[in-house]
UniProtKB/Swiss-Prot annotation:
<keyword id="KW-0472">Membrane</keyword>
<dbReference type="Pfam" id="PF02931">
    <property type="entry name" value="Neur_chan_LBD"/>
</dbReference>
<keyword id="KW-1133">Transmembrane helix</keyword>
<dbReference type="GO" id="GO:1902495">
    <property type="term" value="C:transmembrane transporter complex"/>
</dbReference>
<keyword id="KW-0628">Postsynaptic cell membrane</keyword>
<dbReference type="InterPro" id="IPR006201">
    <property type="entry name" value="Neur_channel"/>
</dbReference>
<feature type="disulfide bond">
    <location>
        <begin position="248"/>
        <end position="249"/>
    </location>
</feature>
<dbReference type="InterPro" id="IPR038050">
    <property type="entry name" value="Neuro_actylchol_rec"/>
</dbReference>
<dbReference type="GO" id="GO:0043005">
    <property type="term" value="C:neuron projection"/>
</dbReference>
<dbReference type="GO" id="GO:1904315">
    <property type="term" value="F:transmitter-gated monoatomic ion channel activity involved in regulation of postsynaptic membrane potential"/>
</dbReference>
<keyword id="KW-0675">Receptor</keyword>
<dbReference type="InterPro" id="IPR006029">
    <property type="entry name" value="Neurotrans-gated_channel_TM"/>
</dbReference>
<keyword id="KW-0812">Transmembrane</keyword>
<dbReference type="GO" id="GO:0090326">
    <property type="term" value="P:positive regulation of locomotion involved in locomotory behavior"/>
</dbReference>
<dbReference type="GO" id="GO:0045211">
    <property type="term" value="C:postsynaptic membrane"/>
</dbReference>
<keyword id="KW-1015">Disulfide bond</keyword>
<dbReference type="GO" id="GO:0045202">
    <property type="term" value="C:synapse"/>
</dbReference>
Amino acid sequence: MTLKIRTIIILFCVISVTTTSQSLNATLKTFDPRLLNSTADRDIAMKNVPLVRLTRHLLSPERYDVRVRPILDHKKSLKVHISISLYQIIEVDEPSQNIKLNVWMIQKWRDEYLDWNPNEYGMINSTIIPFHHLWIPDTYLYNSVKMSRDETERYMNIQATSNYWKGEKGAELSFLYPAIYTITCRLNIRFFPYDRQNCTLTISSWTNSKSALDYYADTEVSMQSFIPNEEWQVKSFKIHRHEYKYACCAEPWVILQASLVIQRKPLYYLVNLIIPTSIITLVAITGFFTPASTDDDRTEKINLGITTLLAMSILMLMVSDQMPTTSEFVPLIAWFYLSIIIIISIGTFLTSVVLSVQGRRQYGRNPPQFIRYIFFVLLPQVLLLNVPPPLQTLWGELDDDPLNVRRRKKSHYLSRNVNNGSTKMASPMSTLRVPQSAGSVSEKRQSFQMIDVTSPNSPNTARSRAPSLAPSTAKATMWEGTMSALAGTNTQLRRTSNVFNKEVDEMRRKRQCSLEWEFLATVLDRFLLIVFVGAVVIVTAGLILVGRMAQYSYDHPDDRFFNV
């Protein structure tokens, strides 16, 4: 009985061991080491990753300190190479005298503390490390408007490349990051909108002199990724290295100066400001000096001048908003607007003068003879003006043509000189007088209209004497009465004719006076129109010419003739 019990117990144990062994084998087959959850298990797994081992090796606190300049011999300076790539000109703020640029910065230096053998770390020759785990130079933009780095630079990671294959210690670090710099720039807008600006980025360390950090840079700034600007054209962007000594330190400081030369594109200002201003001025000047309106009045031209002045003032304010506040010089476009305003002001004043000239017709006095000769004879030929036919007719009827009057004066002056010379010679012919046509044509015509029949020498009297011998006394008395009545009627008619002729002549002279002053104002209008249109054209062409000369002087600084 006891033997049977022992046999049963042994069989049960064998079966239990077999079952446990099978379940253990099944569990081992389904085991996945990635399912480890404990920290110790993860550390054991991560230690086998080469990149993790390399990073922990390089950044271990026992061998690397971000506060220490990464060079084994601290008596030597650490060389830092800087490259700049211009991406975009964001804004040029003339009133604030600054410029905003989007650039890509690259700083390269050698970190002698980051040393590893790629053979020990899975042939890893290069790795990426966050910037805050490594020492970086305190490179600073001296003339930055914004002081905070968070507002200007966006730091990323640093690429480390081993120098093991070069047989040297350490690693080469490349620190690439984008930046938006707003730098101060003294803008010279003397020849605006044909100006060229030179803005400089001053880059160096803020706390380390040349003995600690020695900066180098590429000569040219890369423009491969540059987005062209619609207003500015980049002429050059070069980096210059300088060494300066300051009073604080015995060692010199290395300063990198990146000079950005940009030139403004003037087409926008020509199309939107200069040409419209010239057109408005020409229209205003043409309105100033055109003939009178239908109501024979020029007073509306004063209102036109004042309105144009207001328009020019508004345009000048628009330009001044883009200019910096300076008293050192006046920009070229400001000279242009100032000249245009002066031209319009003088034109408005001279329009008042023309109105005054036109208004003198109410006084009933003709212009002086020299004025008549200049404005009625000389200037109309030059200005391609014709004397109005009514005025020419009046000159012919009144024998008052300015050219004939001048000729008569010359002939009278010559004849007087001849008479004076003849008197000195005491010639018998000196008693003779040359007939003078002092009277007008109307007076000559009037002298033949009426004949005094009572004159004893008249032919009517002679004829009346012949029959007076035959008739009787009664007939003679009747004849004498008739002749007396005729003589009185003739005298009355002569007086009436004289009064009528005088009134007609007076009306003609008043009409002549009015037409002459009106034509004088028209000649003045045409003359001033040509003068002021020429002035506007000269001012506009002068602006463009001076601007082109300024651009030429920028491109040819050695040419002294065009050096501005």
